[in-house]
Amino acid sequence: MSLSNKLSIRDLNLKDKRVLIRVDFNVPMKDGAITNNNRIVQALPTVKYALDNGASAVILMSHLGRPNGEAVAKYSLKPVAAEVEKLLGKPVEFLNDCVGPDVEKACQSAKDGKVILLENLRFHIEEEGSAKVDGQKVKADAEAIKKFRASLTTLADIYINDAFGTAHRAHSSMVGVDLSQRAAGFLMQKELEYFAKALENPSRPFLAILGGAKVSDKIQLIENMLDKVNALIICGGMAFTFKKTLDNVKIGKSLFDEPGSKLVQNLVKKAAEKNVKIVFPVDFITADKFAPDASTGYATDDDGIPDGWQGLDCGERSNKLFREEILKSKTIVWNGPSGVFEFDAFSSGTKAVLDAVINATKEGATTIIIGGGDTATAALKWGAEGQVSHISTGGGASLELLEGKELPGVTALSSKN
């Protein structure tokens, strides 16, 4: 799967065409009101581009929450239609469903730059292909899925996917719209461009910073990165599994991943064979409990972490080692925070890595990608947007790309040639 060879909205003639855009309007809501409209704001450039380039209609489709394959009022996209209308400065027609004769008729007759938002795709089990009933997974009927996808396909002439955050899901709206031109919107295109730069043609030295809790959860990520990078920083909770297994460092009641510990020797051996330098933390900020109000302590590798205490962040000596490695690098991919940054007392390690990454950008590092999920949350918490090349919008999707997997939503896009 080449990331750099996918059709983009800029490659298409949109004049007098109905354009169906899969957006990600999965915004946080409270009591029917949107609490953060960032995802809607991010989708607007693609919508505006289609309108400015003569599209006869723009039809928007999205999911919201997890309604489990049935209509649930609190997951309706109706409040989102009002927000899109406000931000776009033009009327948005909201339809009470996303498929079926009424929806098909409304979309097929839309003209003069009309904007339509369909109801939540996940109100139908056919979107995800399954639902949970009484705790059991129930699969959607194969014929019903075909019919659902066929109905979506009749709504427009051109399909645009701008929902990178869902690109790792083989859902109907991601892979089942059977139009001849299927292209990436601006958000999707930006994600693909940056990941292509890092994974297909990186400037070197190439560094991966990998945090997170369990080695066993990140095994594919570490394996794939070892084939690509020059250096690897291992931080976060999974560092303790490496430290205890390799050097018998005392880790107190810090996170220890028993299944993951069995993989450590092979990973280190592979790194040596590939000439990849691994940098581990050497000191830690410790806590007597996992809580924001925990008492804090300090421990080094030599002394180890006392019984009853756990490491929740990397210490200053570790941060200095990480910074030195970061400032040497031209391409950096960061997935997984350095510590429990959600608790102020244990946030300085993650902040130090972020500061170093921003510094590296200023000093000429060409491509810096901060993976989605917790790492992106940390970066946004400290206002890093615009200070590094790219903060990914997709947690699961970015992780799967870094693991070397193909993303169904990307594979489904048309290639340029």
From Swiss-Prot:
Q: Which sites bind ADP?
A: G212, G236, F341
Q: Which cofactor does it need?
A: Mg(2+)
CDD domains found in the cross-reference section = Phosphoglycerate_kinase
One Pfam family for this entry, by name?
PGK
Q: Which InterPro entries match?
A: Phosphoglycerate_kinase, Phosphoglycerate_kinase_CS, Phosphoglycerate_kinase_N, Phosphoglycerate_kinase_sf
Residue positions annotated to bind ATP are: A213, K218, G237, G311, E342, D374, T375
A GO biological-process term: gluconeogenesis
Which PROSITE patterns does the annotation name?
Answer: PGLYCERATE_KINASE
Enzyme class, one word? transferase
Q: Tell where it localizes.
A: Cytoplasm; Mitochondrion
Swiss-Prot/TrEMBL keywords: ATP-binding, Cytoplasm, Glycolysis, Kinase, Magnesium, Metal-binding, Mitochondrion, Nucleotide-binding, Transferase
What EC number(s) would the UniProt record show? 2.7.2.3
Annotated pathway: Carbohydrate degradation; glycolysis; pyruvate from D-glyceraldehyde 3-phosphate: step 2/5
Protein residues bound to CDP: G212, D217, G236, G336, F341
The record lists AMP as bound by A213, K214, K218, G237, G311, E342
Q: From the UniProt record, list the reaction(s) this protein catalyses.
A: (2R)-3-phosphoglycerate + ATP = (2R)-3-phospho-glyceroyl phosphate + ADP
Looking at the keywords, is Signal present?
Answer: no
User: What Gene Ontology terms describe what this protein does at the molecular function level?
Assistant: ADP binding; ATP binding; metal ion binding; phosphoglycerate kinase activity
Mind naming one GO cellular-component term on file for this protein? cytosol
Subunit structure of this chain's protein: Monomer.
| Known function | Catalyzes one of the two ATP producing reactions in the glycolytic pathway via the reversible conversion of 1,3-diphosphoglycerate to 3-phosphoglycerate. Both L- and D- forms of purine and pyrimidine nucleotides can be used as substrates, but the activity is much lower on pyrimidines. Negatively regulates the biosynthesis of acetyl-CoA from pyruvate in the mitochondrion.
Which family is it part of? Belongs to the phosphoglycerate kinase family.
Q: What is this protein called?
A: Phosphoglycerate kinase 1
From the broadest rank down, the organism's phylogenetic lineage runs: Eukaryota, Fungi, Fungi incertae sedis, Mucoromycota, Mucoromycotina
